[in-house]
Amino acid sequence: MNPKNRLIVLLLVDLVFFLGLITPATAAIRQIEEAPGQILSQSRQTLEDKAGNAWQVVFFKQTKTKQPSTINLRLVGFPGAIAFIHPKDLAINIRPGMTLMAADVFAEKSPAPNVGQYDFNKIAAQWQSNSFWELELPVTGEEKLELRIPYFVIQEWQSIIAN
């Protein structure tokens, strides 16, 4: 590319940013008042596991007046393709040599076979991360199915816990 064309491209890119046509990425955190004194804060992401399966990943905190908050991670796989093993805890590989376990909330009964939900209250107290996490998903038919959680998603989750 010659210098004149390079300058034109650079000016166009600057103009696009200046006019606000491209906005910076923002956190996808939602807050909903479910009832008076009851707030739900959540982050929703669609992520792919190492096998190429798409997952709906919902991290949420429910806060009720005069009650301790509950913090959960819900994982939803494609119906008919994925089935969680219940009761089975979720292994969270924070870094080499550090694996935390999140208790299965649906140990008694899951709303659907492709849905898993895990208690993150104890995980929040031990939270350490400056990198991605890998979740070992307790599903049927797979030797080891892993879902990588990018660092920007973990930062959203930390923001939900802090508020």
Task: Give short role names for the model-derived ranges.
Residues L147-N163:
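Short beta-strand elements
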Residues M1-K4:
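N-terminal secretory signal peptides that target proteins for export/translocation
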Residues A83-D89, A103, E146-R148:
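Short, hydrophobic/aromatic beta-strand segments
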Residues I29-T65:
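Transition segment at domain starts
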Residues A51-L90:
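Short, surface-exposed binding/anchoring microloops in extracellular/periplasmic proteins
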Residues T23-A27:
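Sec/Tat signal peptide C-region and signal peptidase I cleavage site
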Residues A81, P96-E142:
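Short, solvent-exposed, Trp/other aromatic-anchored flexible loops in extracytoplasmic proteins
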Residues V9-L21:
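Bacterial N-terminal signal peptides
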